[in-house]
C-alpha cells in the first residue's frame, strides 16, 4: 500500500515501498497521463508520479528545494512549456488558479495543447519569451514565473517578464543551463554570472539547487522580486 505525505502545498512524497524517493501531484484530470507517468491511487485519490528525469522543477524538489513558491491558488507564468510535462504538474498544484504557459515552437505546441485537454487552468500561448509584450494582452499579474528556456540570455528573459508580469514580492524560478549560455566556460562561473545579473536587476536569490544527476550542468535559482 502506497504511503502519502504532503511535502509542500499540493506536492506529495510517495512511498511505494521500494525505497525510491518519489514525489507526485493530485491528478487534476484523473486517468489521464501526459508523458507516460505512473498513476497511483490512495484512498480514492489519484496521484501522478512527478518524474525528476523529465522535469527540472521535479528534480529540484527531489534534490532539496527549501521552499516551493507555487502553491494552491498561485497564478503562474511558465516560460518554455515544451510538450507540457512540468506545466501539467504545476497546474495540478495551482488547482483552480491560472497557469499561463509560453512555448515558441509550433510543432511542440501542438503536443502541448493535447496535454492541456481537460486542464481548465492551463493556458497554452504560442510566443517568444524574449518578447513579453507580444502576450501582455493575455497574461495578468502573476505570483510566480518559472523559466526553462535554453537561450544564452536566460537571466535577462526572466527579468524582462518579471517587469511585465511579476507582482512585487513574487517569485522567479529559473533553470539555468550552463551550456546554453557558453559552451566553453566553467559551469560554476556561468551560474555565478547569471545569479549576479538577476541580483543586479531586482531579484533577491533565496535558493539555488544543483539538479544533477537528473540534468548535467543545470542549476535552479529561486528569487524574490523586489521590482524595478
Swiss-Prot record:
Binding site for S-adenosyl-L-methionine: 85-86, 103-104, 128-129, 148-151
GO biological process terms on file: box C/D sno(s)RNA 3'-end processing; tRNA processing
Cross-referenced InterPro entries: Fibrillarin, Fibrillarin_CS, SAM-dependent_MTases_sf
Keyword Translocase attributed: no
Alphabetized UniProt keyword annotations: Methyltransferase, RNA-binding, rRNA processing, Transferase, tRNA processing
SUPFAM superfamilies given in the database record: S-adenosyl-L-methionine-dependent methyltransferases
tRNA processing found in the keyword field: yes
EC number(s) reported in the record: 2.1.1.-
Gene Ontology molecular function terms on file: histone H2AQ104 methyltransferase activity; RNA binding; rRNA methyltransferase activity
Pfam families: Fibrillarin
Subunit structure: Interacts with nop5. Component of box C/D small ribonucleoprotein (sRNP) particles that contain rpl7ae, FlpA and nop5, plus a guide RNA.
Cross-referenced PANTHER family: FIBRILLARIN, RRNA 2-O-METHYLTRANSFERASE FIBRILLARIN
HAMAP family, per database record: RNA_methyltransf_FlpA
Homology family: Belongs to the methyltransferase superfamily. Fibrillarin family.
General function of this protein: Involved in pre-rRNA and tRNA processing. Utilizes the methyl donor S-adenosyl-L-methionine to catalyze the site-specific 2'-hydroxyl methylation of ribose moieties in rRNA and tRNA. Site specificity is provided by a guide RNA that base pairs with the substrate. Methylation occurs at a characteristic distance from the sequence involved in base pairing with the guide RNA.
Name listed for the protein in its UniProt record: Fibrillarin-like rRNA/tRNA 2'-O-methyltransferase
Originating organism: Methanococcus voltae
Name of the gene encoding the protein in the UniProt record: flpA
